[in-house]
Structures are given as C-alpha cells and as structure tokens.
Amino acid sequence: VAERIIIEVKNSPAKISSVEQKKGTTAQRLPYSLSALQIDAGKVFGYSPQDVLDAQQSLYEKKYTSYPRSDCDYLPENQLADKDAILENLAVLSAPFSAFAEKADRSIKSRAWNDKKISAHHAIIPTTVRPEYAALSEKEKNLYGLIARAYIAQFYPAQEFLSTKVELSAGGEMFTASGKVILQQGWKSFYQNDAKKDDVENEEEQQSLPDMQQGDSVEFAGGKIVEGVTKLPTRFTPATLLKAMKEIHKYVHDKELAASLKECSGIGTEATRASIIEMLQKREYIRLEKKQLVPTDLGISLCKILPDKILFP
C-alpha cells in the first residue's frame, strides 16, 4: 500500500487544499505545588522526592519559602501585595534568575492569583525574607531557583505564537503538515535552556512552514518507506513515578474506580508520596539503577502472587 501511494503521488499534481493560521498564547506556568516541584527537580537535577521534601523543609524553616507540603499551585489575591518586596529580593541576589526578576513587569497579574482555587495552603513561593543565598546548600539553591523562576514568570507576558496547518491533495490522498512560529517568547524566555526531550510541543515550535496559499501547486520531492518497531515503555524514575501516583486514574481500567482516584488526587498525599517510594526501596521491592526504578526479584515475586484485580484494576 505504501509503495502504491508513493507512485501515485509522484505521478500526480499536488495542490494546497487549505491553509489555516491561528494566533495563540501560552499562559504563564503556575507556581509550584510540592509534587510539581518534586517532579521538576527530579527531571532537572536528579533529586529524589524525599531529597526535595527535606531540602524544602529546610528552606521553610529558614523562612525563605512558604509552606512546603502544599498541594495547591495558585495564590490568594491578597498575596499580590508582597510582589514588590519579593521581586526586589530576587533581583539583588547573585543568582541566575536575578536579572529576570529585575526586568519583571509588576503590572502583570497572571491567572495564578485566584482565591477560588486556594486549598488549605497556597502554592510554594519565595517569602519576603531575603535569603543568605551564599550560605545555602547546593540543593537549597537549586530548589530556591526553581521556585523563584516560577514566581518571576507570573510577571512576564504570555508567550505568543502563530500556528499553521496545511492540507494538500495528491494522487487521491490527503496530506497534512503543521508548524508553529514564536512571535514573542514572553515568560518562556528564561526557560529556553530547560531540556524536555519528551515535550512534543517543543519539537513543533522548531518547525516553521513557508508562506503558502490555497490553490498553490507543490512539487513532489520524494518519498520513502520507513520501517520501525514500537518502543517499550520507559522505566519510571522517582519523579515520574511520583507523577503517576498522583495521576493513577490514567492507569486504571475500572471507570468508577478511576473517577474516585482522580477526585482524591491518586495514591498518597503531597506529604506522603515520597515516603511511599522510599518504603518500597527499603523493603527491596524496587531499586534505583542508573536513575531508573527497576523491580527486584522480590518485587516481581510479589506481583506474581497478587490477583489481577489488584495489579490491573
């Protein structure tokens, strides 16, 4: 079938059937909840969820950041009154994020300030207490940096982009292509160096399309058949397992059970998920190998004796 399509397209005229362009925006990322901070710190620095919780507790006890075990990523509107003090503190520190704090537009109010979204505690943010930055441990500096950047992002404009979708017909077949051009980086300007290999959107952002109009003729440059095999699912890291625990409903087939798990935010709480992973390691059901979690013989044996309704609910 693939060979036939290549031949038919090669010997047929091709025309642009439609061109659709839309301007869009990407809103500022939200400040951190504990689990979101643990996930990002795991991806960026390789920290375990417990490492993050311990270091974050230390920052909290030093009064440099707000309550560390929060499950919320929004801020109360009255907290906006602290923005000047916080941004001024961040701007004078000798830290990678300080230049961005200095250029922040304090007139911007992002979606993060929303009283209706607040739970028992608000998102984790820097406090008005200026940290003794040089005295912080490396982990504390790195975590404070993540939290500071997420806070500073609230005072930068949304990212603006132009997305293009093109449909063309050739040989009785319809083909599509899409791309995205960034018009203004906005808050994403200081997240440019973050490596997110699994971010499909980032790949699309790098693909731009030439100017085309409906009815334009296009030339067939060539075609080839590529054979491939599906990849095995990647193993969990402590960070991705933490995310899966919070979103466990996505792995559950029973719709009623999945709905219940989604409502209660999955397995464990913000404060206990890290300790659950640690407990599994201490009991030798799983082990950390090259930054990935792998089951031990004991863990595999346990799974073999458990009923399917437990393993695959």
Regions found by a protein language model. Name each.
Residues 1-313:
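Core catalytic DNA strand-manipulation module of type IA topoisomerases
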